[in-house]
């Protein structure tokens, strides 16, 4: 199994998401039943993978905000590239048996939506004094 954080518009809050995963893991579940999917085992491995991807999304996003504070269109374009690179690498590292190009093709909608969600989050926190 392979999972990744959803950062789709407009609800992405990395700290709240991280806290939710940590609360679930504190209960030491044997398995999970993600919405729209069946049972998954290997919960500790999946949680670690999920949190590592979340950390990467957050760090990359904050770096982009620092580099491009006033250029939302350029941030979105860069976010699409970063999200794509992160998700494709993560899927392949988890054993997905396809080429990087095919993984990118299969993840295209998720890449687009997650980049948009990251862009909304960065715009929101970029306005915060």
Regions found by a protein language model. Give the residues of each.
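Metallo-beta-lactamase
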Residues: 1-44
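Functionally constrained cores in energy, signaling, and assembly domains
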Residues: 18, 47, 126
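Histidine/acidic-residue-rich catalytic or RNA/ligand-binding cores of hydrolases
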Residues: 43-52
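Generic structural signal for well-ordered, non-membrane alpha-helices
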Residues: 52-59
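C-terminal regulatory/interaction regions
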Residues: 59, 63-129
